[in-house]
């Protein structure tokens, strides 16, 4: 059964998609509430732990989330969405419980690590699900626009809602987070298991399962999986630094943006909140329209526009202090990410081989996530050594480099070398990363 939404040219919302959307929203609420609002204050003011312990705990969450995405993607291919997400959410429930009732930094650090590992399957599951549901329908960009709305919405709602309850009792706040995860767990039970398309049953039957041959054969199965990926995933080598730079540019600004607004621009917390809401609203309003246009006309123009706009806007924040200019730049940054968010993953989806899509998604997400791990570390050093503008200049430079890389790898007429599975799928013609029904396989 599928639901039609007025204004959508194609059927996008399915029960599976809606479940993934709600799970994404709830998990982002929990993560943003914990990492932004609760842990820094709870660990410092209530438990009396050091700033170093707080920083390490937050880093452990990012590391667990990032480096377990590839295994999670591999697991989705073999046991399906339901079991993968259920395992991750059960682990997340246990992690939040450890954080809530653990009073030592070691226990809280363990909880943060488990939370990262538990939420790692989320993006591979979502992207794999969208890839499967939109295959042949040319509406991946539209679907990504809707999913990104849940991500941004959950990230914004979490800290705001939790702030309403945090003054009464931290215990009550933790129960709210556990309740959100419990609802997500119930929704995960509605996800499909291993779904095999008719045309791919033979290929899937040949694919090694998690338990095929017992644990002693697991290493051989993994080796076979990565051999298949190496033979069939033939993309431009420049795609890998592009994946890193896309998140590195954001990671550079994440730890210092609040400090910059308060100490350099001298704005109040209320005005800072208004700026964030304004930029976020511009992004959210543009996600679905840009996603639909990318489905129709391809991703190249929209990504180039987004990267150029982000480069100029972030550079402007480093150079200008006038409030009128700051407002314009914030709106432009919001618009740039409305161009980038739904179209970036759409472009990546066109690079996937026929088999092992979940594993490849996890691999790409791990590379991309490294930028969010490295960026904050470098950002602080840049601030201390070269001043407040330095992180913005490096972030703008990263966006500029990303624009140049994308101009090169997406240029018209570019020929790529593909593995046997892709050559068979395209009749021997190289695959161009421009999507949309009007784009052709070159």
Which sequence ranges carry the predicted segments?
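Juxtamembrane intracellular "pre-TM" segments in multi-pass secondary transporters
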Residues: 2-14, 195-240, 423-438
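Helix-loop boundary and gating motifs at the non-cytosolic
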Residues: 12-62, 235-238, 242, 247-265
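Residue-level signature of mid-helix packing/kink "hotspots" within the transmembrane helices
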Residues: 62-70, 155-156, 280-288, 372-373
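Helix-to-loop junctions at the C-terminal end of transmembrane segments
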Residues: 67-80, 166, 287-298, 383-384
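Structural signature of the two symmetry-related core transmembrane helices
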Residues: 83-97, 301-316
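Paired small-residue
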Residues: 95, 106-114, 324-332
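Symmetry-related core transmembrane helices of the 12-TM Major Facilitator Superfamily/SLC fold
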Residues: 173-190, 392-407
């Amino acid at each position: 059964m599928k639901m039609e939404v007025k204004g959508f040219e194609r059927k996008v919302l399915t029960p599976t998609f809606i479940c993934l959307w709600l799970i994404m929203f709830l998990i982002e609420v929990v993560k943003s509430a914990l990492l932004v609002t609760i842990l820094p204050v709870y660990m410092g003011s209530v438990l009396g732990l050091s700033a170093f312990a707080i920083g390490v705990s937050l880093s452990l969450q990012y590391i667990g989330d990032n480096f377990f995405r590839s295994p999670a993607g591999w697991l989705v291919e073999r046991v399906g969405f339901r079991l993968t997400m259920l395992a991750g959410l059960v682990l997340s429930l246990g992690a939040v419980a450890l954080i809530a009732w653990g009073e030592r930094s070691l226990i809280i650090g363990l909880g943060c690590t488990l939370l990262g590992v538990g939420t790692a399957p989320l993006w591979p599951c979502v992207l794999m699900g969208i890839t499967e549901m939109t295959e042949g329908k040319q509406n991946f960009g539209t679907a990504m626009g809707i999913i990104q709305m849940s991500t941004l919405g959950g990230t914004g709602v979490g800290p705001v809602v939790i702030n309403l309850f945090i003054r009464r009792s931290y215990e009550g706040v933790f129960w709210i987070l556990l309740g959100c995860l419990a609802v997500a767990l119930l929704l995960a039970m509605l996800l499909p298991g291993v779904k095999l398309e008719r045309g791919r049953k033979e290929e899937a039957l040949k694919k090694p399962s998690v338990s095929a041959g017992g644990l002693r054969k697991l290493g051989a199965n993994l080796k076979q999986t990565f051999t298949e990926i190496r033979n069939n995933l033939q993309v431009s080598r420049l795609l890998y630094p592009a994946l890193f730079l896309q998140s590195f540019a954001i990671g550079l600004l994440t730890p210092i943006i609040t400090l910059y607004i308060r100490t350099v621009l001298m704005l109040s917390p209320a005005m800072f909140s208004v700026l964030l809401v304004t930029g976020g609203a511009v992004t959210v309003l543009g996600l679905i329209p840009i996603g639909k246009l990318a489905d129709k006309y391809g991703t190249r123009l929209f990504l180039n526009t987004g990267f150029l706009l982000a480069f100029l806007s972030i550079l402007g924040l480093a150079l200008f202090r006038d409030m009128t200019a700051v407002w314009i730049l914030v709106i432009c940054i919001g618009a740039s990410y409305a161009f980038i968010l739904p179209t970036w993953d759409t472009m990546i989806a066109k690079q996937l081989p026929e088999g092992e899509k979940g594993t490849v998604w996890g691999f790409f997400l791990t590379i991309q996530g490294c930028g969010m791990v490295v960026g904050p570390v470098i950002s602080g050093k840049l601030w201390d050594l070269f001043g407040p503008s330095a992180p913005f200049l490096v972030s703008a430079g990263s966006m500029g480099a990303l624009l140049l890389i994308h101009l090169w790898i997406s240029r018209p007429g570019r020929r790529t070398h593909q593995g046997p599975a892709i050559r068979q799928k395209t009749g021997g013609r190289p695959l161009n990363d421009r999507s949309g029904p009007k784009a052709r396989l070159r």
